[in-house]
Amino acid sequence: MTIRVAINGFGRIGRNVLRALYESGKRAEISVVAINELADATGIAHLLKYDSSHGRFAWDIRVNNDLLQVGDDAIRLFHHADIADLPWGELGIDVVLDCSGVYGSRADGEAHIAQGAKKVLFSHPGTIDLDATVVFGVNQHELKKQHRIVSNASCTTNCIIPIIKMMDDAFGIESGTVTTIHAAMNDQPVIDAYHKDLRRTRAAGQSIIPVDTKLAAGITRIFPKFKDHFEAISVRVPTINVTAIDLSVTVKNAVNVLDVNKLIQKSATGAFRGIVDYTELPLVSTDFNHDPHSAIVDGTQTRVSGQHLIKTLVWCDNEWGFANRMLDTTLAMAATGFK
């Protein structure tokens, strides 16, 4: 059975989800039948076709009134600000991928279900009272049929959690700190402009900008045992895509650099194949653009101090990798069945 999907919010993640669907070979399993986005159809089609980070979309894109043609596929377009106006029941929607960045509460998920959707997947952490938070590759096996309102966590959580998981299983993590070196985002101004966060008043292309992050809380949501054992900070840098994460952990077992890198290499070709990758090439951020993995560890940057303090550099395409995980989690949700 093909899963009938609607995308609510067709910004950076929404568009990348659709592009990833067409590039990943999952179209026999997932069909996007509707998109809800306030922008007009011409703008939707243009930004789907032409992308400053990911280049031109290979499929033909046409607009016929409020039908978006992607190759031979016709996708209904809606422009509603209120979930209550969306015809999910009429369209037989199995899963809504809410990529708006606006909605994320249980009430928001219930609103989609009230309109006829069977399940909802949010593209950000959402509130703590959702049915489940999934980091694909780590805990998707915990999904149950009754989990109707689910979060796909965040791009940085998807990046770091698999690495934490493998290191904890192998070496026993005691505590850790995380520094996210994140590409600029569209909540930052091109030139200085007002914002309640005074650092975010500053031009995105001119500075390295510290911002708040809830990544430590995201780690705890997946691994409750690490409550008060991880801290995180984040800075935005003047690039438009790809993020690096500096992960430092203290571990119980004595280790060296070779131990750490062997673990990651083995995991990348085994339990975390397709989720984690490993490289020792002299690469820079742009080389990871359009990489579908959740995390790519640069083994040349692994450090160990005093046998118990590990530092690793982990890359991710914060758009493309996460968009691919949205598709994976959609399939995992559908595999549990629909009520």
UniProtKB/Swiss-Prot annotation:
Its EC number is 1.2.1.72. Substrate binds at residues 154-156, 200, 213-214, 236. Pathway: Cofactor biosynthesis; pyridoxine 5'-phosphate biosynthesis; pyridoxine 5'-phosphate from D-erythrose 4-phosphate: step 1/5. The record marks 182 as: Activates thiol group during catalysis. GO terms for molecular function: erythrose-4-phosphate dehydrogenase activity; NAD binding. It catalyses: D-erythrose 4-phosphate + NAD(+) + H2O = 4-phospho-D-erythronate + NADH + 2 H(+). GO terms for cellular component: cytoplasm. NAD(+) binds at residues 12-13, 318. It holds the Pfam family Gp_dh_N. The keyword Oxidoreductase applies. The active site is at residue 155. PROSITE patterns: GAPDH. Its main location: cytoplasm. It is found in: Cytoplasm. It comes from the Bacteria. One of its GO terms (biological process) is pyridoxal phosphate biosynthetic process. InterPro entries: E4P_DH_bac, GlycerAld/Erythrose_P_DH, GlycerAld_3-P_DH_AS, GlycerAld_3-P_DH_cat, GlycerAld_3-P_DH_NAD(P)-bd, NAD(P)-bd_dom_sf. Keywords: Cytoplasm, NAD, Oxidoreductase, Pyridoxine biosynthesis. Homotetramer. Catalyzes the NAD-dependent conversion of D-erythrose 4-phosphate to 4-phosphoerythronate. Belongs to the glyceraldehyde-3-phosphate dehydrogenase family. Epd subfamily. This is D-erythrose-4-phosphate dehydrogenase. It comes from Proteus mirabilis (strain HI4320). The lineage of its organism: Bacteria, Pseudomonadati, Pseudomonadota, Gammaproteobacteria, Enterobacterales. The gene is epd.
